[in-house]
A protein has these predicted regions:
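Internal helix-loop-helix
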Residues: 48-111, 115-120, 162-168, 289, ...
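A short core secondary-structure module
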Residues: 149-150, 154-200
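Glycine-rich phosphate/cofactor-binding loops in nucleotide/flavin-utilizing enzymes
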Residues: 2, 69, 73-77, 96, ...
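Glycine-rich phosphate/pyrophosphate-binding beta-alpha loops
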Residues: 94, 134, 158-163, 205-206, ...
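A short, Trp-centered hydrophobic/proline-enriched beta-strand micro-motif
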Residues: 120-128, 172
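Glycine-rich beta->alpha junctions and the first turn(s) of the following alpha-helix
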Residues: 3-5, 197-291, 355
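C-terminal helix-coil-helix/basic helical segment that borders enzyme active sites and/or dimer interfaces
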Residues: 28-34, 268-279, 289-343
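A structural signal for short hydrophobic beta-strand segments in well-ordered beta-sheet cores
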Residues: 142-145
Length: 382
C-alpha cells in the first residue's frame, strides 16, 4: 500500500493550519462535568461556524464530504496547533456514535442526529458495559420490553464515560426476552433526559469524575430509536466497536506522536541528567509511534476491512501510551512530578492505566487477534 497526499491535500493542509493557528482556544480544557461539556461544545461550534466540522462525514448531513486522508490531515494539524485533545467529551459523537449512525442508522435518525453532532448541539455517551458484562459483553442483561411502539428499559450500565453531561446514549440492551448471548440484543438511541434514568458519577484514580453508573427504571424509548433491526444489535455494536478501535485511533495516535516528540525535546534540555537507558527507551518509543502511525493508516485503508482489524491498532496504541507516559515519569523524576500538581504529564500518566481496559481490555484484544485474525483455536475451554 502506498499512502500519499496529493497537491490538493497539501493545499487543504495549509488552509487548515492557518485557521487552526488563529482559532485554537488558549485555555486548558476542564477535566469533567458541565465545564468540560461547555468547553468541548464551544470548540465544535467554532469549527462548525467556520466550516470545519465533519471533514469526512457525508455532505447530505452537514459534513464536508471529503476523503479520509483530509480527516487525517485535520487531526495532524489540530495536534500541531495545540487544539483540545480528541479524547474530550465529543469523542463518542465524532468517533463512534456518528459513524455508526452513518453506517447503520435510518434516514430519519441520520437527518436528526448527525447535523446536531456537527453543530455542537449534542453530546453522546456509550452504554454497553454492565457490572457483570464488560469483556463478556454478550452476557448483558439490561432489558427492553416491547410495549406498543415503545421499549420499556430496566437495568444498569457502568463505566459510562460522560453520562452525566451527555444528551444521548448508544444503549445496548436485550430486547428479545429469553434470548441468549449475541442474539436478541438491540442498539438503541437513548435520550439521557428521559424519566427513569439515574446517573451516579464515579471518581477515577486521577481524581477525575468522568464516568458513571447509569440506572434505568421503566424508561420508555420509542421503537423508532432502534438503530438497525430490532434484535440485531450485536451486529450494530460490532460496527461501533470497529470504529472505536480503528478510526478513533487516528486522532489519538497523532496526539501520542506529539507527546513523544515533546519528551524528546524535554530529554534534550535535561541531557546531563538523562542516562543512556532512558534515551534508548525514548528512541524506541519514537520508532514505535512511527510504526503505530503506519499501522493505523494501513488498517484504515485496508480492503476488505473487518471489524476485528482495529484490535491490533487498539492494543499497540494502548500499550505504547502506557510506555510513553511511564518514560515521562522517569524523565521528570518523582520530585518534579510532585512539585508541579498542574503538570499535564501526571494526569496523562494516571489516565493511561485505563488504556488497556477501555474499549476492550488488552487480553480481549489479544483473544480477538488470535482467534479472529490469526485463526488460532479458542483457548481456555470456553
Ligand atoms: C476509562 C474507561 C472508560 C470506559 N468507558 C466506557 C463507556 O463509555 N461505555 C462503556 O460501555 N464501557 C466503558 N468502559 C468499560 C470497559 O469497556 C470495560 O471496563 C472493559 O470492557 C472490561 O470489562 P470489565 O471492567 O467488566 O472487566 P472484566 O470483563 O471483568 O475483566 C476483568 C479481567 O479479566 C480479564 N478477562 C476477562 N475475560 C477474559 C477472557 N475471555 N480472556 C482473557 N482475559 C479475560 C480482563 O482482560 C480483565 O483483566 C470504560 C472503561 C474505562 C477503563
Amino acid at each position: 500500500m502506498r499512502f500519499e497526499f496529493t497537491e490538493e491535500d497539501r493545499a487543504f493542509r495549509e488552509e487548515a493550519r492557518r485557521w487552526l493557528l488563529a482559532n485554537v482556544p488558549s485555555a486548558r480544557a476542564p477535566m469533567g462535568g458541565p465545564a468540560a461539556r461547555a468547553f468541548a461544545l464551544d470548540w465544535v461550534r467554532k469549527r462548525h461556524a467556520a466550516g470545519w466540522s465533519g471533514i469526512s462525514w457525508p455532505a447530505a448531513y452537514g459534513g464536508l464530504g471529503l476523503s479520509y486522508e483530509r480527516q487525517i490531515i485535520w487531526h495532524e494539524e489540530s495536534v500541531a496547533a495545540g487544539a483540545p485533545s480528541p479524547l474530550d467529551p465529543t469523542f463518542v459523537c465524532f468517533n463512534h456514535a456518528g459513524p455508526t449512525l452513518i453506517a447503520c442508522g435510518s434516514e430519519a435518525q441520520k437527518s436528526f442526529h448527525l447535523p446536531k453532532i456537527l453543530a455542537g448541539e449534542a453530546l453522546w455517551c456509550q452504554g454497553f458495559s454492565e457490572p457483570d458484562s464488560g469483556s463478556d459483553l454478550a452476557s448483558l442483561r439490561t432489558s427492553g420490553r416491547v410495549e406498543g411502539d415503545h421499549l420499556v428499559v430496566n437495568g444498569q450500565k457502568i463505566w459510562t464515560t460522560h453520562a452525566d453531561i451527555a444528551d444521548y446514549q448508544e444503549l445496548l440492551i436485550r430486547t428479545d426476552p429469553g434470548s441468549q448471548r449475541h442474539k436478541g440484543l438491540s442498539w438503541v438511541i437513548c435520550d439521557m433526559k428521559l424519566p427513569g434514568i439515574t446517573v451516579r458519577p464515579i471518581e477515577n484514580m486521577a481524581g477525575v469524575t468522568h464516568f458513571a453508573q447509569v440506572f434505568y427504571d421503566d424508561v420508555r424509548i420509542p421503537l423508532s430509536n432502534v438503530v438497525g433491526a430490532l434484535h440485531d444489535g450485536w451486529n450494530v455494536a460490532m460496527t461501533t466497536l470497529g470504529f472505536e478501535r480503528a478510526t478513533a485511533a487516528t486522532a489519538l495516535q497523532v496526539e501520542l506522536s506529539a507527546r513523544i516528540e515533546a519528551l524528546s525535546a524535554m530529554a534534550r534540555m535535561r541531557s546531563d541528567a538523562v542516562d543512556g537507558g532512558l534515551l534508548h527507551r525514548i528512541a524506541v518509543a519514537r520508532a514505535e509511534a512511527a510504526a503505530l502511525r503506519a499501522l493505523t493508516y494501513k488498517t484504515l485503508f485496508k480492503e476488505p476491512a473487518t471489524p476485528f482489524d482495529g484490535s491490533i491498532v487498539r492494543l499497540f496504541f494502548a500499550e505504547l501510551a502506557q510506555r510513553i507516559y511511564r518514560i515521562a515519569m522517569d524523565l521528570l523524576g518523582p520530585q518534579n512530578a510532585e512539585a508541579s500538581p498542574d503538570n499535564e504529564w501526571i494526569p496523562a500518566y494516571l489516565e493511561a492505566f485505563s488504556e488497556t481496559i477501555a474499549g476492550g481490555t488488552a487480553e480481549i484484544q489479544r483473544n480477538i487477534i488470535g482467534e479472529r485474525i490469526l485463526g488460532l483455536p479458542r483457548g481456555g475451554g470456553r
